């Protein structure tokens, strides 16, 4: 079985660089499966819970923030500011961050900044929902 190189990149660096069997990613058009030899694609992605099967058959879920995805036959890259594995989420830190973002969103009048805050709030809510499973 041929494997796909899966990278998650952010302004702060490489968040993930592993070979995978498959991953399920949510684009603005819906979920798509990633695996080796997939047709090339560039797509916007939404904040979502991504299911990944790694080359060693282990399965993990990750919360990925909104961003952009570039797929080639042998490689998939996701460009996002937010990425964390679901099993590494700190509930207390996430709740503090959520409260802070909710406070900010009510006081900011700048539409562009509000969109950014909404995206970050969505990411924090996904982190919390992943822990309720």
Swiss-Prot record:
Alphabetical keyword list: ATP synthesis, Cell membrane, CF(1), Hydrogen ion transport, Ion transport, Membrane, Transport
Cellular component GO terms held in the UniProt record: plasma membrane; proton-transporting ATP synthase complex
Cell compartments where the protein resides: Cell membrane
Family assignment from sequence similarity: Belongs to the ATPase epsilon chain family.
Role noted for this protein: Produces ATP from ADP in the presence of a proton gradient across the membrane.
HAMAP family: ATP_synth_epsil_bac (MF_00530)
Protein name (Swiss-Prot/TrEMBL): ATP synthase epsilon chain
Source species of the chain: Mycoplasma genitalium (strain ATCC 33530 / DSM 19775 / NCTC 10195 / G37)
Origin organism lineage: Bacteria, Bacillati, Mycoplasmatota, Mycoplasmoidales, Mycoplasmoidaceae
């Amino acid at each position: 079985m041929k494997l796909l190189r899966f990278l998650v990149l952010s302004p702060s660096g490489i968040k993930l660089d592993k070979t995978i069997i498959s991953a399920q990613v949510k684009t603005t058009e819906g979920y798509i499966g990633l695996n080796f030899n997939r047709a090339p694609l560039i797509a916007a992605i939404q904040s979502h819970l991504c299911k990944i099967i790694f080359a060693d058959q282990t399965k993990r879920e990750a919360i990925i923030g909104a961003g952009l995805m570039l797929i080639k036959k042998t490689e998939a890259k996701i460009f996002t500011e937010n990425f964390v594995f679901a099993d590494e989420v700190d509930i207390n830190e996430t709740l503090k961050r959520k409260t802070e973002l909710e406070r900010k969103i009510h006081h900011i009048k700048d539409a562009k900044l509000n969109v950014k805050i909404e995206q970050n709030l969505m990411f924090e809510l996904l982190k919390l929902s992943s822990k309720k499973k």
